[in-house]
Amino acid sequence: MEEAGPFSIEPVIVLDEVFPGHTNALNTLFGGRLMSIMDTAAGMSASKFAHREFVTVSVDALKFRRPAFQGDIIRTTARVVWTSPRTVGVHVTSCRLSRSEWIGEEICSGFFFMVAIDDSMKPVEIPQFEPKSDEEEEMWSRAQSA
C-alpha cells in the first residue's frame, strides 16, 4: 500500500485582536498570550497537514521583535516546514496590523514542534513533507537546526 502524502501544505492564518485584558500596564500584548495564539495556529497547521491530533513538544528560536498594542490586529501565519516520522516542525510568524493601514509589521516568529498522537495519546506516523523550492529547503534546514 502506498503511503499517503500530506493533505495540505497551505499555511493557516489566524486573526486576533488585542483587547485590554490581553495587555500589561504599558498596554502592550502579554508575550504568553501571543505564544498561545501562535501555538494554536501551529496545531491547526499540523492537523491540516496530516489530519491528526498533535501536541506541542517544544518551541525553538522564538524571537519577540517588537510589541503589539491594545487595539492592534494580530495576524499569525503557520506553515509546516519540516517533518520526521511522527513530528512536524511548524514555522509561525505573527505581525501586528494597525487599523489605519492594515500593513503587517512582524512582531514575533519561531518554530513549534508537534507530535502526532492517537486516541490513546501514543505517537503515530504522519505523511512526510518534501521541500521542493529553495525557500522550502532553507526553512527545512532552519527548522532542523532549531
Role assignments for model-derived ranges:
Residues 2, 8-14, 69-70, 81-146:
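HotDog/MaoC-like acyl-thioester-processing domains
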Residues 9, 29, 40-77, 81-83, ...:
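Hydrophobic beta-strand-centered segment that forms part of the acyl-chain substrate-binding groove
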